[in-house]
């Protein structure tokens, strides 16, 4: 509360309570005091106070605004003004008031000793005084000083307190001295007056909110400077016709008011709004050397004494003080003790020390006593039986040691260029077996091996990853660049070709989950038709030796190690990714059927892929697919260290069924004889050398789970395919005779860019001071089962089995 409000309140006589005007009544009692007290409406105080708070240059404008804004308040409180000016006190209706007895000098001295000039603290209701009248007078003294400090009054627990809370006496909102036409542009208003009228009014609201959260004078100054900068921006924008002029008037008034306020603050040293709620402690160096002087002058709050700048140390913020509040607030709230301060204010006086060095009367302990007692080491004075008088001190919680190992996220991105062929559909039959059981229907859909690590990182990047590393997300973007259709210019009349053939492009996601086929690598083609595959082998990822060998994805993309690759210098053995060159996708999707099973023919694969006219999608991203593995471990998981006796824990009751890693055995695909049986598999923590090989699948949720009795919902990573449909060679009508098969195809190929990116998470925690490797707790340990899942076979109901890989066909 400002000087003007304090003076007005003081002249109104001791005992007046200022509450919001919308609850003015003569029925509110002071609880235990029980005296009906006439009330002075806050509206009139607000009108006078906030007119002066704007600053001298704006005093005239503020006075006019105050009169206009609070005209009705001034009229309703005319008798209150008359009381203040004449000294003949009446209530709001003009009736004479019953005069109170003045507070005795004894009560004032008692209050000085108890509160030590600090009225931010709560009123100690449990003080045991000689008479009830002393407590009544002490409360009047306490509330009188709180009003002078601009703080809300304390209501004792009684009828008056309950009534005040039920009527929300201390929660009413005030308008403040706002500029006409605005809701927040001006001092003293509340923070919930509805939506701002325009942009400068919104800036003023943000400024008020910053005030309400300010804990230091620096934060108040920062809030002022921020508002002034925004106001000047509005003025400049209006001059440049970038903003409505409606903000300009308010911006000029607001900036002028803040500037005037800061000038007055610099001259007087008084900060508005008040940040006096900051609890201050006397610097320990003065406590030791000036102890007698401090004890003598602290009851008067060092009035009239020029103190050193470092006399106080401000350590407690406004939010930590139970009575702290900002000048701009929604409403005054009753003084309430925080849990950490209950020991300071609620201690029974009978338990206080009767030491002659304790200057407190009636057994009340003060902050000075605590400070002085703690500043006399070795004397034993002022201490309790526990070795130190901790009454009134906050609880000190000793920080616990903790190491946050954190998680490191690394992103690996590669850009590959691949060539695909417009392969023709052809049925490949098994040879050398009676009955020709296996049948493959070839397609042009080339597999993009995004389930394999080499697509994202080279050998060194993989080797340098620590144990426990796992892929948390991978993403692939497939961009179709263009296609090429070739033909022989010297062809005979039966194999003519033109330049305007139609070529279609196909894309598919998740064909592996259908269970209708598998990926294969082609090892032979028809001699006179290079677009027709005639033989196949298992898909190629790692290096394959022999006539149909493959260098492997690592050597193909990134090159081989010159120290151990005998073919390092051979022609064509260069790192395609490293030089931005094209290489080939090795595997293509094939549908599969066993002829002795009544499967019902070839299913409609076209329902599950998308087709495009290749001429319309050049340089277009046709696939952008992301996947988050359920269990993407790519390095051996962290282990736990067993300590205690016995190391072999024996049987442990877990109170429920163990969620063992079960496997389903499916036999007899025919509907009539199909059976699904369950097998429970024990958890194992050892891993074969190839389990976390660079060519292992990223998704391992069918084989791994977390914790000794944890459970995972297994899944497989969906496949990605892109293909260029075979382009037929144009011929004469000979093919229409006797329904001759179409087996003449033009050489065609397509070019695609694949941008592959994966995010790897790693963490290296340790809980033992001499552990030589990272470790974790048993609940985070990863276990495996002994089922060898084979992703080179077709899936069943969305998961892979452990059947053998189909050999060469």
Swiss-Prot record:
It is found in: Virion. The lineage of its organism: Viruses, Monodnaviria, Shotokuvirae, Cossaviricota, Quintoviricetes. Residues 379-390 have a biased composition (Gly residues). One of its GO terms (molecular function) is structural molecule activity. Residues 315-366, 373-392 are annotated as: Disordered. InterPro entries: Capsid/spike_ssDNA_virus, Capsid_VP4_densovirus, Phospholipase_A2-like. One of its GO terms (cellular component) is T=1 icosahedral viral capsid. GO terms for biological process: clathrin-dependent endocytosis of virus by host cell; symbiont entry into host cell via permeabilization of host membrane; virion attachment to host cell. The keyword tRNA-binding does not apply. The N-terminus of VP1 is sequestered within the mature capsid. It contains a phospholipase A2-like region and putative nuclear localization signals. Pfam families: Denso_VP4, Phospholip_A2_4. Residues 315-325, 346-365 have a biased composition (Polar residues). Its main location: virion. This is Capsid protein VP1. It comes from Diatraea saccharalis densovirus (DsDNV). Keywords: Capsid protein, Clathrin-mediated endocytosis of virus by host, Host-virus interaction, T=1 icosahedral capsid protein, Viral attachment to host cell, Viral penetration into host cytoplasm, Viral penetration via permeabilization of host membrane, Virion, Virus endocytosis by host, Virus entry into host cell. Capsid protein self-assembles to form an icosahedral capsid with a T=1 symmetry, about 22 nm in diameter, and consisting of 60 copies of size variants of the capsid proteins, which differ in the N-terminushe capsid encapsulates the genomic ssDNA. Capsid proteins are responsible for the attachment to host cell receptors. This attachment induces virion internalization predominantly through clathrin-dependent endocytosis.
């Amino acid at each position: 509360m400002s000087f003007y409000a304090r003076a007005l309140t003081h002249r109104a006589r001791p005992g007046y309570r200022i509450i919001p005007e919308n609850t003015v009544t003569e029925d509110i009692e002071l609880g235990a005091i029980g005296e009906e007290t006439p009330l002075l409406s806050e509206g009139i105080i607000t009108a006078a106070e906030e007119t002066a708070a704007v600053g001298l240059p704006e005093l005239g404008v503020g006075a006019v605004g105050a009169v206009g804004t609070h005209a009705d308040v001034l009229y309703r409180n005319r008798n209150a003004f008359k009381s203040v000016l004449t000294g003949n006190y009446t209530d709001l209706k003009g009736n004479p008031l019953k005069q109170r007895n003045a507070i005795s000098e004894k009560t004032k001295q008692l209050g000085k000793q108890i509160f030590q000039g600090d009225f931010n603290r709560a009123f100690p209701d449990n003080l045991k005084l000689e008479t009830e009248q002393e407590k009544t007078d002490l409360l009047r003294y306490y509330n009188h000083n709180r009003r002078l400090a601009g703080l809300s009054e304390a209501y004792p627990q009684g009828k008056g307190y309950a009534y005040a809370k039920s009527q929300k006496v201390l929660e009413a909102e005030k308008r403040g001295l706002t500029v006409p036409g605005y809701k927040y542009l001006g001092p003293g208003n509340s923070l919930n007056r509805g939506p701002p009228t325009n942009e400068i009014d919104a800036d003023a609201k943000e400024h008020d909110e910053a005030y309400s959260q300010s804990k230091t004078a620096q934060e108040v100054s920062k809030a002022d400077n921020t508002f002034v900068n925004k106001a000047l921006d509005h003025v400049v924008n209006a001059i440049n016709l970038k903003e409505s002029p409606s903000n300009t008037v308010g911006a000029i008034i607001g900036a002028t008011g803040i500037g005037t306020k800061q000038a007055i603050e610099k001259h007087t040293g008084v900060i508005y709004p008040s940040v006096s709620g900051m609890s201050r402690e006397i610097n320990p160096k003065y406590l030791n050397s000036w102890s007698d002087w401090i004890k003598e002058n602290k009851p008067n709050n060092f009035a009239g004494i020029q103190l050193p700048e470092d006399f106080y140390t401000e350590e407690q913020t406004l939010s930590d003080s139970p009575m702290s509040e900002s000048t701009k607030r929604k409403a005054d709230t009753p003084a309430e003790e925080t849990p950490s301060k209950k020991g300071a204010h609620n201690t029974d006086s009978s338990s206080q020390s009767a030491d002659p060095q304790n200057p407190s009367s009636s057994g009340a302990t003060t902050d000075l006593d605590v400070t002085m007692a703690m500043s006399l080491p070795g004397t034993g004075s002022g201490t309790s039986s526990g070795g130190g008088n901790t009454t009134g001190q906050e609880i000190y919680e000793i920080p616990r040691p903790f190491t946050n190992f954190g998680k490191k996220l690394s992103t690996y991105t590669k850009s590959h260029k691949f060539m695909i062929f417009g392969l023709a559909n052809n049925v490949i039959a098994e040879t050398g077996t009676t009955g020709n059981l296996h049948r493959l229907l070839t397609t042009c859909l080339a597999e993009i091996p995004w389930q394999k690590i080499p697509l994202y990182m080279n050998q060194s990047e993989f080797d340098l990853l620590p144990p426990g590393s796992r892929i948390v997300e991978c993403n692939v973007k497939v961009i179709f660049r263009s296609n090429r259709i070739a033909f022989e210019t010297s062809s005979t009349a039966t194999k003519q070709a033109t330049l305007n053939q139609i070529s279609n492009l196909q894309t598919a996601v998740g064909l592996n989950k259908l269970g209708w086929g598998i990926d294969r690598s082609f090892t032979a083609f028809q001699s006179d038709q290079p677009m027709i595959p005639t033989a196949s082998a298992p898909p190629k990822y790692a290096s394959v030796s022999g006539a149909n060998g493959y260098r492997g994805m690592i050597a193909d993309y990134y090159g081989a190690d010159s120290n151990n690759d005998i073919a390092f210098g051979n022609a064509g053995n260069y790192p395609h990714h490293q030089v931005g060159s094209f290489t080939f996708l090795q595997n293509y999707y094939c549908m599969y059927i066993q002829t002795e099973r009544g499967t019902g023919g070839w299913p409609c694969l076209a329902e599950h892929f998308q087709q495009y006219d290749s001429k319309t999608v050049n340089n277009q991203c046709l696939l952008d697919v992301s996947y988050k593995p359920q269990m993407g471990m790519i390095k051996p998981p962290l282990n736990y260290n067993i300590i205690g006796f016995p190391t072999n824990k024996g049987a442990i009751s877990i109170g429920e069924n163990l969620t063992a890693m079960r496997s389903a055995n499916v036999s007899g695909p025919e509907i009539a004889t199909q059976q699904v049986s369950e097998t429970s598999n024990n958890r194992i923590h050892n891993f074969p050398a190839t389990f976390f090989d660079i060519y292992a699948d990223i998704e391992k949720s069918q084989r791994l789970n977390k914790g000794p009795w944890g459970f995972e919902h297994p899944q497989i990573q969906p496949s990605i395919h892109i293909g260029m449909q075979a382009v037929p060679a144009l011929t004469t009508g000979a093919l229409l005779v006797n329904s001759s098969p179409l087996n003449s195809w033009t050489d065609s190929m397509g070019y695609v860019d694949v941008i592959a990116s994966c995010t790897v998470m790693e963490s290296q925690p340790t809980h033992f001071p001499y552990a030589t490797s990272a470790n974790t707790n048993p609940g985070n340990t990863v276990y495996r089962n002994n089922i060898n899942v084979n992703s080179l076979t077709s899936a069943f109901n969305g998961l892979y089995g452990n059947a053998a890989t189909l050999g060469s066909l």
